[in-house]
């Protein structure tokens, strides 16, 4: 089967898109993917069974709302035209579209008229995301407009997927789509993220010369509330002089600069190290060298209702115990015996949790094992089968 796919992201950097494309290739399907083009990338490229068609646009992080609107609109127009051209050549059975933005699903108008079924993959819930980023009211014109686009997009799609049950339930409060929406989680890829026994030897409280390593990877964004995390780290160092933190990833340039300035002003540059983003294949080895995963979030309407950080799931899959901001979505999957929660605005509580886990290696081991068991029903092989079933049902219907 040949499948068309559209995403406003880079390939293969978007992990969810990459995993789905590779899953399709594994069963012999061919994918024509339309996406963004970064500097130095080829306009067209074949990666396995994935034909990548990159449009001459880049994503600019940290821009204002008007900048995002202009970027999304430009991508929509180019993707609409590119997908139409590809459709006349291949006549797809299914076309899958990933949000953001929601209205990107309408790039499939031509293939849908010609008989293709449309699968909309909702990575995020846009109205609440804009509330989180821009502080808009749920009674504002902008919020209502975003809800309108969401409702129109979900009504237009033949089937809908989303990333966790909390975001699904929120969609259902304002969209009558229970008959066509399913959850396919961002479960870690077991080819890379697999528990194989203890990684770094857990340092005891008596071995002060051995570093106790905290680890974080992924985007560095304001809504992840690194200020509290760094303050908590600084407090914990009073009890753990050997404490270290490695942060891998990129993010909003202005915010990243603020975070690095805070580290420099507190003379922590030797203890908190920033690294460039690395390919997903390299992340597991870095996790194995860590003693504790760090997952900070700022609790707001978006994060608390729908956000389940993929990095946390990757730490769980690798058997790395984690400290995480207490947010509703994470608590709906894990309890306090599986993840060490702290109030999102309490560096004191974070520091207390870090010190407690440092002093109790057996507690870290028990927490990691319980988290692995808790997430077993959501592992990728199960999600992959669900993804295949959705596509097969679309073809048969």
What are these regions (language model features)?
Residues 336-347, 356-362:
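Conserved acidic donor-binding segment of nucleotide-sugar-dependent glycosyltransferases
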Residues 206-233, 246:
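Conserved donor-binding/catalytic core segment of Leloir-type glycosyltransferases
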Residues 257-284:
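Nucleotide-activated donor-binding/catalytic signature segment of Leloir-type glycosyltransferases, i.e.
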Residues 224, 281-286, 293-313, 324-332:
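Nucleotide-sugar-dependent
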Residues 84, 103-114, 120, 126, ...:
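Membrane-proximal helix-turn-helix segments that form the acceptor-binding/catalytic region
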Residues 172-173, 178, 188-205, 210, ...:
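Acidic anion/phosphate-binding donor-loop and adjacent secondary structure
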Residues 166, 187:
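Carbohydrate-associated surface elements
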Residues 349, 356, 363-377, 389:
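A short, well-ordered alpha-helix in the C-terminal region of glycosyltransferases
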